């Protein structure tokens, strides 16, 4: 084999340049040389070879390979060039500087050596260096094709839409002639290495052309391998499913068609996959029925539909479209709980007492016939006492009253046990028929929305507790306790506002965090402080082990209520059916498949979230580009060493870079604030501020503001001790040239809205900021 021949030659000769090695192995010709280079590259990534500074090649010595222990994990890149090593959920990430990344790409499995251990007292992460790439994650890329004759052997290149990939991707000359207007998807054939700082790829598909309607969003989705089209065999299976249940389908099901069953969704929703019924029982308890479309009855394990659902993991929702997990024939047809038609469901029938506790329940396969298709807006009108809505739906007015009463009971119960209510604001981007954003507004959530969410939570908990008590292999939705270091940072920061949180980072109750949230409610910057607390939490994920749900303060939790759009819910439905008679064979089967499905579902969920964020940032930046040069009022959302982010009231967010400020500013890590060296002017989280928009880049999603002096400005006296320490720091840093703005910028969590002084419409966010400023004065 070539690998052994290379090693034998280098053992005999010590070291060699690539050309001499190729000649010695008779591989200098055009036919064999590329294969040699590919093998050398792979051996280097496996730490079998090393390049010297003079470009010569040699075997790594055993003592070099074994000198330091390595750690394996997944590399997570930042677009600024640095990154982090993620080992597992129980380990803190390690920081990898841009000079230590090597040729690792976001998502690669890598081996690192630890350069500097973590310092828990200082709260600093361990620092590491990539020494080997075990597995490449990037298999495809998407971008605009650029004609280029810089490298004659290639047709041109693309720049990936993924900003974490810095290098050009050169395209092999293909039978299809590319003109330079195409958005193409390519398969990666060769990765960057020393002396070869670019990718080589082959064209897989032409996604579209510049100027096509919606091509910007499609490019983002394709770059993340989120594909709308279903394979032919998947569509064939979906089309073969009957449009209505047959008598055979109803055998063994609990018949609930006589119940007054209601769906409550958005006005434009088509996949109505959940419905409820409610009764007040003679003993004063409530009967709540949560009915979910029985998707698993139609999507059988191992089928083409099932395999495609596993591959997708979840539906993806971006500004102007949905990429569904399952074909619309299912989601909008047989599995949509449309009014006055029989539908197969799985139901959680719960008896709930006045304290919000489930005292009796049944989880069953059922058949229902929904009575009303309601919208959130109409139900909110009924709750608010709108006479027209109450008259139109008089027959279910009492049901709605019962729903509200039960919702409040459940809400109180969860609050008492310590559930954290992170009711953060979300943006709704309104686009025209060409996909161009025309407005950005706050997404409204009324009692009806929270009420349905409350009932879904109850069903999810009930199902999870049922299977945990039965000690059957199961998939849980878990949210582990926050890591002490992150929580301590937040506790320290909250103390700078004069807010003391009872307990320590190692032992703090949800009740203490609830008290904090109640204390800051209504105060300037409360939304930002709640978001900072949320960011100190761990990410929820799927697991075969039950660790409870910290945020909900729930001992048991799963996802049961959305099998149309989440694979774990589909899996739970399948287990509800199969565990009716839980044989050992079924136990063993699910115990074997659940861990991998839990991991993949968690990863695919995060991919979907990333796609949604990228598209949102892009569309917000596109919207704001029209208003460059205009002034806006907002609040300081976060402060970092290189500046601070400003958020407008409708969630638009942009960066004020420290280099754009009129004097030298010092960063206080404890208070997360910046203070002017001469003026004493302070920028800290929550304070109002006036800014001017100077940049809105649709391609990167970045929005940049410039600070403007205003009545909002805060000045604090500079302490003498601070002056002395600052002088010392300035002296020690004089030898350096400073920090480049481009290298310091991180991903701006774009949140955008806004009209201008020139616009005919009075700005929502300016109105809000003015109202707040009047209150403060």
Predicted regions and their residues:
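Conserved catalytic alpha/beta cores of large enzymes that bind or transform nucleotide phosphates
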Residues: 316-415
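A generic structural motif
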Residues: 79, 134-137, 149, 207, ...
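Short secondary-structure boundary/capping segments
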Residues: 218-220, 304-309, 446, 491-493, ...
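Structured core elements
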Residues: 74, 84, 95, 111, ...
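Phosphate-interacting basic helix/loop segments used at nucleotide- and nucleic-acid interfaces
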Residues: 187, 256-262, 267-283, 403-417, ...
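Charge-lined substrate channels and their catalytic hotspots, especially those that engage the 3′ end
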Residues: 1-289, 296-342, 373, 380-381, ...
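Append "with occasional cross-activation on large, charged helical scaffolds in nucleic-acid assemblies
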Residues: 363, 376-648, 662, 666, ...
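Single-stranded RNA-binding regions, centering on S1/OB-family and related RNA-binding modules
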Residues: 90-100, 167-169, 214-220, 285, ...
